[in-house]
Amino acid sequence: MAADLETAKRECVVTRAAEELLTGYERPIVLMKRRIGGKAATSVAPDNPYIGVILPYAPLQLLLFSYNDGLHMPDLLVMTSANRSGMPICRTDEEVRTDLPGLCDLILSHDRDILLRVDDSVVTLFEEEPYMIRRSRGYAPLPIYVNGDFHGTVLSAGGELKNTVCLAKDNLFYLSPHIGDVGCVRTETAQHECAVRLRDLLEITPQCGAADIHPAYESSQLVKQA
């Protein structure tokens, strides 16, 4: 996370299209070519010519860089989601204490509960056009319009890896935020909660479902339950 656009330009080659993504209201992580001589540690994405950069999008993140408390805060911070690999993002203090011991020194809590998990979106550029790698915060569940003669409602459960569910009504396809790999009970629960939330939010009852043909996949079970 860079404190501002100038910091991002110091670390990466920021094209006009990349700048529009970085400063847009969606505020995704943008993969860009790193500059030689930047201040980012070589241990950040080692042996990779690209790094993902995001600008602050929440008040707390702005305060990390600008709060006048006498402490000098670097203008570039390593940022990651509050979860272990293969697990959903922690949503409660108890989940943080259970899942992240040894990974963080301090926990900032609040009396306002987190109701919905959502990852940062990840975008790169191909010929100066946005290319979505992970469609989540800022983009989901905004619909994608698909040309064709489509009628009815469908729930698509996605695969076991890098999972996302989709609820379609006629030509509008509503993708959920990124869920992740479905391989444990908690991730399966998160997938189910996400599908129910999408259904209730859009007031769409699926008439049929689409899933991987493997009967043991949790995504297949989700469609059967729906």
Give the location of each predicted region.
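Active-site-adjacent structural elements in enzyme catalytic cores
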Residues: 1-226
